[in-house]
Design a protein with these regions (language model features):
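Midchain, well-structured core segments that form catalytic/ion-binding scaffolds
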Residues: 95, 110, 119-132, 165-287, ...
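A non-catalytic alpha/beta surface segment that caps or lines the substrate-entry region
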Residues: 15-62, 66-68, 72, 83
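Short glycine-aspartate micro-motif
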Residues: 64-68, 184-188, 208, 362-364
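Metal-dependent amide/peptide-bond hydrolase catalytic core
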Residues: 229-402
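Short, conserved micro-motifs enriched in small and acidic residues
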Residues: 21, 128-139, 222-230, 378-385
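N-terminal capping segment at the start of a domain
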Residues: 1-21, 123, 215, 313, ...
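Active-site metal-coordination/substrate-binding segment of hydrolases
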Residues: 60-158, 163, 183
């Protein structure tokens, strides 16, 4: 709850790194608290990353594992003046937030919340997000670190801790020093419901269609003017209405999603995000988009257009399939915590995906964070306690199997 009160929102419009200096306010506190635990090498680097090591206490040669969470919170809702509230022994009904009583966390709209009857639920007060994404993960790693440092009877290998900035703007591991991190395998603590274990995520590309029209004075434009704006609108309108969009897909279905249109009569840009669990399907989606573009363009004499595709990230399953023990050990740790593992796929990206392709195979483990990026955000304290237990058991599992 202390961490939640520190404003650490990242800024998607910033070109600095980290995108906001205030993220370091929490990072500096984490370094101080890690050092107070006896983790003497805890440090904050110039880019806003926290690195720390829990030393091994076993003679076995155990792979070095890393636990990672991000300190920044989303810019989708205010993160200033967060006032966390504990709703003790939640009664299973709606939660009305006191600072804005129009903000109600409905048990009907949030069935997972309804299943947490009897738990202690943390929310914000109604005017901000909570920031459990991912301060729940940060707190869980810190609690587990404190436990391991004070319980030498729990045997484990060297454990690396990594706290990152700017995950919410897609730049979370952009400047991670992998040599300094020096870990063999990793786990992001950034998942949702109790027991969830995510070892697969979307593969992602970005695409930009640039339409070039012909400008003319509106008063004498007949048979001359060709509007790039209108052509761009036709391209977007030609996308399927009942498929291939975020609002019409779920489970393992991919999509083509226009996220920005900007321009003039002479030149208009349309930005798309293209997603699918199968990397090979991205090319098919991009070919489909090109056909739409060409078909629309053929109706407008003199107009031109280009399509540029940029790789964004890939499905971490492509890496993790070669290291099955990483996910298997996590599932075993979750079971030891008394929870049934729920294997899930992420309809989005994760720092773990990028880390996996940077040489650190890295699935995602639950934290309890729910209703992310909103004033309705909540987390169960009991779920968080189970996440802490999972981290501790996971350290033990790796040592036992070494």
């Amino acid at each position: 709850m202390r961490y939640a009160q520190i404003d650490t929102q990242s800024d998607p419009m910033s070109n600095t790194f980290p995108t906001t200096e205030k993220q370091k306010d929490l990072s500096r506190l984490l370094v101080k608290e890690l050092q107070e635990m006896g983790i003497t090498d805890a440090e904050l680097d110039e880019h806003g990353y926290v690195y720390a090591t829990i030393p091994a206490n076993t003679d076995k040669k155990v792979p070095v594992i890393c636990f990672c969470s991000h300190v920044d919170t989303s810019s989708d809702s205010s993160g200033t003046g967060v006032k966390p509230i504990v709703h003790s022994r939640y009664d299973g009904g709606d939660i009305v937030l006191p600072d804005d009583e129009t903000v109600v966390i409905s048990a009907k709209e949030h069935p997972y919340l309804a299943s947490k009857k009897g738990d202690d639920i943390i929310t914000a007060s109604g005017t901000t997000l909570l920031g459990a994404d991912d301060k729940a993960g940060v707190a869980e790693i810190m609690d587990a670190a404190n436990f391991l440092m004070t319980h030498p009877e729990v045997k484990h290998g060297a454990i690396r801790i990594l706290f990152t900035p700017d995950e919410e703007v897609g730049r979370g591991v952009e400047k991670v020093d992998m040599k300094k991190l020096a870990a063999d395998f990793g786990y992001t603590m950034d998942g949702g419901e109790l027991g969830s274990l995510e070892d697969e995520n979307f593969s992602a590309d970005g695409a930009r269609i640039t339409v070039y029209g012909i400008s003319a004075h509106p008063g004498s434009a007949k048979d001359k003017l060709v509007s790039a704006i209108k052509i761009a609108g036709e391209i977007v309108d030609a996308l399927p209405k009942d498929s291939l969009s975020p609002e019409t897909t779920d489970d393992r279905e991919g999509f083509i999603h226009p996220v920005r249109i900007q321009g003039t009569v002479e030149k208009t840009e349309i930005d798309f995000i293209i997603r699918d669990f199968e990397t090979a399907h991205l090319e098919a989606h991009e070919t489909f988009l090109r056909r739409i573009m060409d078909k629309v363009l053929a109706k407008h004499h003199g107009a031109k257009a280009t399509l540029k595709v940029t790789e964004q990230y890939r499905n971490m399953k492509e890496v993790l399939v070669n290291h099955p023990e990483v996910t298997a050990n996590a599932a075993e740790a979750i079971r030891r915590a008394g929870v049934q593992p729920l294997r899930m796929s992420i309809r989005g990206g994760t720092d773990g995906s990028r880390l996996s392709f940077m040489g650190l195979p890295c699935p995602n483990i639950f934290t309890g964070e729910m209703a992310l990026h909103s004033k309705h955000e909540y987390v169960s304290i009991q779920d968080m306690q189970k996440a802490v237990q999972t981290i501790v058991y996971l350290a033990q599992v790796w040592e036992e199997k070494a």
